[in-house]
């Protein structure tokens, strides 16, 4: 067991599958045009890989292979996508596979610029290297003093052959000829750091974004400033120009706002406020189309269209996830295809495990929607609800009224949500008599019928509300259900029993209809989380002492207790059949407990502590969310498609760290057989031929080999044809020929041997078979295994022929018959192949019973064998009678 636990390198039950809800980060996107397909594609960075979307439908086209570190910058040309990670960058073909890798930098790369058949890379130490793409060789290397000229932007001006323009944090710009390695000109700048460089539609004109929020339109050929614009939102993060006939420039800001400037009138024509909730990482106008692509660190990719008379962009398509870490996730529905998630950004979203086009956002909760509509507030941050801490969902009546209820951080009232309408519901559920600000909702649940919501408060009160009308339907207990804060509420599947638990360490069972206390259980420690599996009636409790207690709500007793976590337990989940309890804790571990055996069967560590776990209703995936992560991570259940050893793990088992899955489906890794050591847990168990010498053991032969041995004559009689087979009519025109290049007729065969006899030689038929020979050998050495194996390999007719040939009349002998009886005795002594011994003995007696009394040797042998058979059957009969007695008692007893 210890060797098996040492060899296990990952989870035995779960394998990383993919990540959901990740679309963008703070790395600027890259837009490419495919001349073959005549389409635009946008590439966004997601951690250690990047996504490629079709702009037309914003559908995911490809996900790249992962790189060892997080991607720090990207670039693309017409054929390849370049991504830098650390001090290395790679070229990807077909948006997926790495075809070239460039190594030479000693510091982190933060700029990449395609340059024909070359690629320019710049690191944080001021080293600029020009590479030949296909040979992966260095063409030129330039070194810049960071204190004098620290590169902050790079651009290849249009029509400027072999020239690049570099911007610096000190404010100056330099124009270099990279072929001759010469500095052509130094622009003094505007004494403010350069943050962005963008080629204008006009030749020789470049837009320069500054730290001060200014955008300078500058002619680099004549070193002349054409116009200046200024934004009050901080440094310019990115710049883009429309090329569809409208002289408009867009500039991004760290506030998430976008300014639209008219280059003819030299004025601001529009503002796109709150285009993103974080800084604009990148914005790009598609060539000759009124479409603007933006992305930001808020995990959103948006496409805006400018088709209105005011010139303001409206949102056309988007892919959006959570912009802040998640607070709660739960599978929604019974098909296991939707996952509801709440985040610290205040949104409630639904992610599809099938395709991203089925994702939808239920939006932010607003305190007063009518006030917002009446006053037309643009900035709704002041009226938004706090983040959702816990929620419960039920789809039974989702088409009739709201089916989701959520409690918010620091709020007394609980909000309802409608999944079908994808919006917040009509009611805020809270007791009317409570007006204290320090009381908050701490636990929620919805009945399986979808009609009632149960809400627990920090004051110890537990209330019931009608989901259709929002009316208060009663409270549990006289004044309050618990003396401390309510930590969990749950209702069984038939609305008969309500279970609540409080911080004072009590677990209470209530009648759901009349709200009367039925039973109370004192816990060893204060509970932290409570979870009910309605189908099995099993209740899981995570306590503050890092242990887990499992109760049966029918008997109201603790049936299992688990310990092993070294940190606070954040969440739990039951498998659909109720056999497994999966727990996630702050010790970065996810443990799987087997409830029938009461053992830990799986455990693995993660590099980030898991906050939530949820098991799919179909049992195929486990969904997790983690600290400081924006995505939902899916783990496939290995036991559904392969054999998994569920042996209990030892108490000193040390789990290994497992990497979080990426955004693409995990591919199988080919490993050479030499490096794979067989694990004890993966070795298939070979059952011995006999578990114990005292146990009667049957053979593994099918019944057709021995069950019908006594009825062979009846079977042959039934299978005998009623009429002899008809001889086909002769066909004289078919004359036999000899094959060859020239066919010749075959001459009839002539029998020229006058000595050939037509009398059958009975001596040939009387030859002894291998079975008889092995029986004769067994009479000498007392070994019958070979003879028994010959019988096992024969069919029913062959067995009858062999046993019939044992008699002296058919070529056998008395000694051979005696040896056969000894073989049967050996089988009964060893208690192996028990049914074969009975069948072979019965057939032997049927064939030779008449001659046994006349032979003293055989009579003595059969007498001993008879007592042996009777002894075995007497023992078996007593066991059969005992088993039948117990079964009859269980059938008739009133338990």
From Swiss-Prot:
It comes from the Eukaryota. Gene3D superfamilies: YVTN repeat-like/Quinoprotein amine dehydrogenase (2.130.10.10). Keywords: Disease variant, Glaucoma, Nucleus, Phosphoprotein, Repeat, Ribosome biogenesis, rRNA processing, Sensory transduction, Vision, WD repeat. Changing residue 355 to L: In GLC1G; uncertain significance. The modification Phosphoserine is found at residues 382, 399. WD repeats lie at residues 30-63, 72-101, 110-143, 152-186, 193-230, 237-272, 277-320, 327-361, 389-428, 441-475, 486-522, 527-562, 564-605, 607-645. Part of the small subunit (SSU) processome, composed of more than 70 proteins and the RNA chaperone small nucleolar RNA (snoRNA) U3. It holds the Pfam family Beta-prop_WDR36-Utp21_1st. Expressed in heart, placenta, liver, skeletal muscle, kidney and pancreas. In ocular tissues, strong expression in iris, sclera, ciliary muscle, ciliary body, retina and optic nerve. It is linked to Glaucoma 1, open angle, G: A form of primary open angle glaucoma (POAG). POAG is characterized by a specific pattern of optic nerve and visual field defects. The angle of the anterior chamber of the eye is open, and usually the intraocular pressure is increased. However, glaucoma can occur at any intraocular pressure. The disease is generally asymptomatic until the late stages, by which time significant and irreversible optic nerve damage has already taken place. One of its GO terms (molecular function) is RNA binding. InterPro entries: SSU_processome_Utp21 (IPR007319), WD40/YVTN_repeat-like_dom_sf (IPR015943), WD40_repeat_CS (IPR019775), WD40_repeat_dom_sf (IPR036322), WD40_rpt (IPR001680). PROSITE patterns: WD_REPEATS_1 (PS00678), WD_REPEATS_2 (PS50082), WD_REPEATS_REGION (PS50294). Part of the small subunit (SSU) processome, first precursor of the small eukaryotic ribosomal subunit. During the assembly of the SSU processome in the nucleolus, many ribosome biogenesis factors, an RNA chaperone and ribosomal proteins associate with the nascent pre-rRNA and work in concert to generate RNA folding, modifications, rearrangements and cleavage as well as targeted degradation of pre-ribosomal RNA by the RNA exosome. Involved in the nucleolar processing of SSU 18S rRNA. Involved in T-cell activation and highly coregulated with IL2. The WD repeats are grouped into two tandem seven-bladed beta-propeller regions. Depletion of WDR36 mRNA in cultured cells causes apoptotic cell death and consistently associates with a reduced 21S rRNA and delay of 18S rRNA maturation. This is WD repeat-containing protein 36.
């Amino acid at each position: 067991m210890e060797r098996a636990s040492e060899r296990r390198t990952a989870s035995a039950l779960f394998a990383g599958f993919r990540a959901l809800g990740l679309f963008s980060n703070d790395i600027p996107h890259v837009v490419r045009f495919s001349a073959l397909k005549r389409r635009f594609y946008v590439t966004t960075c997601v951690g250690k890989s990047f996504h490629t979307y079709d702009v037309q439908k914003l559908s995911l086209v490809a996900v790249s292979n992962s790189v060892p570190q997080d991607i720090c910058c990207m670039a693309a040309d017409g054929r390849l996508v370049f991504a830098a990670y650390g001090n290395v960058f790679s070229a990807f073909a077909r948006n997926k596979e790495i075809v070239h890798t460039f190594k030479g930098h000693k510091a982190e790369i933060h700029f990449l610029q395609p340059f024909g058949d070359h690629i320019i890379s710049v690191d944080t130490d001021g080293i600029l290297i020009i590479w030949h793409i296909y040979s992966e060789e260095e063409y030129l290397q330039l070194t810049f003093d960071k204190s004098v000229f620290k590169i902050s932007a790079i651009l290849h001006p249009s029509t400027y052959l072999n020239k690049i323009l570099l911007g610096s944090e000190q404010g100056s710009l330099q124009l270099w000829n990279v072929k001759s390695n010469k500095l052509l000109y130094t622009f003094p700048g505007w004494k403010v750091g350069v943050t962005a460089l963008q080629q204008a539609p006009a030749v020789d004109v470049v837009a320069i974004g500054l730290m001060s929020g200014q955008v300078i339109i500058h002619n680099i050929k004549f070193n002349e400033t054409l116009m200046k614009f200024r934004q009050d939102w901080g440094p310019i993060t990115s710049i883009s120009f429309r090329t569809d006939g409208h002289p408009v420039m867009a500039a991004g800001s760290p506030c998430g706002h976008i300014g639209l400037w008219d280059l003819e009138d030299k004025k601001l024509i529009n503002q796109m406020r709150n285009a993103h909730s974080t800084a604009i990482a990148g914005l790009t106008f598609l060539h000759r189309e009124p479409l603007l692509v933006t992305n930001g660190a808020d995990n959103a990719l948006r496409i805006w269209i400018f088709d209105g008379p005011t010139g303001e962009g409206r949102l056309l398509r988007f892919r959006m996830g959570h912009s802040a870490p998640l607070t709660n996730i739960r599978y929604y529905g019974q098909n296991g295809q939707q996952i509801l998630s709440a985040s610290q950004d205040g949104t409630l979203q639904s992610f599809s495990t099938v395709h991203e086009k089925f994702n939808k956002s239920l939006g932010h909760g607003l305190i007063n929607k009518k006030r917002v509509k009446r006053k037309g507030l643009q900035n709704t941050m002041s009226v938004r609800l706090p983040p959702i801490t816990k929620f419960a969902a039920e789809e039974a009546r989702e088409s009739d009224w709201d089916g989701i209820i959520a409690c918010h951080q620091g709020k007394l009232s609980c909000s309802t949500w409608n999944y079908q309408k994808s919006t917040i519901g009509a009611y805020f559920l809270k007791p009317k008599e409570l007006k204290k600000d320090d009381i908050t909702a701490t636990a929620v649940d919805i009945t399986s019928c979808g009609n009632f919501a149960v809400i627990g408060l920090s004051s110890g009160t537990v209330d019931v509300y009608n989901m259709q009308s929002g009316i208060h339907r009663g409270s549990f207990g006289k004044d309050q259900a618990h003396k401390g804060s309510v930590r969990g509420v749950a209702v069984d599947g038939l609305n008969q029993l309500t279970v609540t638990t409080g911080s004072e360490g009590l677990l209470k069972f209530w009648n759901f209809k009349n709200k009367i206390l039925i039973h109370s259980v004192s816990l060893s420690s204060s509970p932290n989380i409570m979870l009910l599996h309605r189908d099995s009636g099993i209740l899981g409790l995570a306590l503050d002492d890092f242990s887990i207690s499992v109760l049966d709500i029918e008997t109201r007793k603790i049936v299992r207790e688990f310990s092993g976590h070294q940190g606070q337990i954040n969440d739990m989940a039951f498998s659909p059949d109720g056999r497994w309890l999966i727990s996630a804790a702050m010790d970065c571990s996810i443990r799987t407990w087997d409830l029938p055996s009461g053992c830990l069967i799986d455990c693995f560590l993660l590099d980030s502590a898991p906050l939530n776990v949820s098991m799919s209703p179909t049992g195929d995936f486990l969904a997790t969310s983690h600290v400081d992560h924006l995505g939902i991570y899916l783990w496939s259940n290995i036991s559904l498609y392969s054999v998994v050893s569920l042996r209990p793990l030892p108490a000193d088992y040390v789990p290994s760290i497992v990497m979080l899955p990426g955004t693409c489906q995990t591919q199988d890794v080919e490993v050479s057989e030499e490096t794979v050591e067989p694990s004890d847990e993966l070795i298939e168990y070979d059952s011995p031929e006999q578990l114990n010498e005292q146990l009667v053991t049957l053979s593994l032969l099918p019944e057709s080999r021995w069950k019908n041995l006594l009825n062979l004559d009846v079977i042959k009689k039934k299978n005998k044809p009623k009429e002899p087979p008809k001889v086909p009519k002769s066909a004289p025109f078919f004359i036999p020929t000899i094959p060859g290049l020239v066919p010749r007729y075959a001459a009839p065969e002539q029998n020229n041997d006058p000595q050939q006899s037509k009398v059958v030689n009975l001596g040939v038929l009387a030859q002894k078979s291998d079975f008889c020979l092995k029986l004769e050998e067994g009479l000498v050495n007392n070994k019958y295994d070979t003879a028994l194996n010959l019988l096992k390999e024969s069919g029913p007719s062959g067995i009858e022929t062999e046993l019939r040939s044992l008699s002296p009349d058919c070529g056998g002998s008395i000694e051979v018959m005696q040896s056969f009886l000894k073989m049967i005795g050996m089988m009964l002594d060893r208690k192996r192949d028990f049914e074969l011994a009975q069948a072979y003995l019965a057939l032997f007696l049927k064939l030779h019973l008449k001659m046994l009394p006349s032979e003293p040797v055989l009579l003595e042998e059969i007498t001993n064998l008879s007592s042996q058979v009777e002894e075995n059957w007497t023992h078996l009969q007593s066991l059969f009678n005992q088993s039948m007695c117990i079964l009859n008692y269980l059938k008739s007893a009133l338990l």
